[in-house]
Amino acid sequence: MKENKIRKNKEFRHVYRRGKSYSNRLLVLYICKNRCNINRLGVSVSKKVGKSVIRNRVKRLIKESYRLNLDENMKKGYDLVFIARNSSNDRDYKDIESALINLLKKAGIYN
């Protein structure tokens, strides 16, 4: 699972510059093709969302909803960066999950 993460600032910047963005009221998705046969995930939560406990909770919810919906219906070979908006700080798992699936469908990589 380690190779499935975007960690370095350089990798995040590459996705922001080269990628296409999709958004809804809770999340923003930047998506960019990579040269691998796997999808890599990056999650970013600004300090505007809340204190560290809230930011970490939002990150965990995004990662878990991605993990549980990662299946053979999703196209491979993309770098995905999810950015949480301020309104996501008081949402529950179902809201985050539906927003995430909505963005993946908008991007055309989830059937």
Swiss-Prot record:
EC number(s) recorded for this UniProt protein: 3.1.26.5
UniProt record, GO biological process: tRNA 3'-end processing; tRNA 5'-leader removal
Domain of life of the source: Bacteria
Xref: Gene3D superfamilies: 3.30.230.10
Catalytic activity: Endonucleolytic cleavage of RNA, removing 5'-extranucleotides from tRNA precursor
Keyword tRNA processing attributed: yes
Pfam families, A to Z: Ribonuclease_P
Keywords, alphabetical: Endonuclease, Hydrolase, Nuclease, RNA-binding, tRNA processing
UniProt KW Repressor keyword: no
InterPro entries xref list: Ribosomal_Su5_D2-typ_SF (IPR020568), Ribsml_uS5_D2-typ_fold_subgr (IPR014721), RNase_P (IPR000100)
An example Gene Ontology molecular-function term: 3'-tRNA processing endoribonuclease activity
Functional description taken from the UniProt entry: RNaseP catalyzes the removal of the 5'-leader sequence from pre-tRNA to produce the mature 5'-terminus. It can also cleave other RNA substrates such as 4.5S RNA. The protein component plays an auxiliary but essential role in vivo by binding to the 5'-leader sequence and broadening the substrate specificity of the ribozyme.
Protein family: Belongs to the RnpA family.
Protein name: Ribonuclease P protein component
Organism per entry: Clostridium botulinum (strain Hall / ATCC 3502 / NCTC 13319 / Type A)
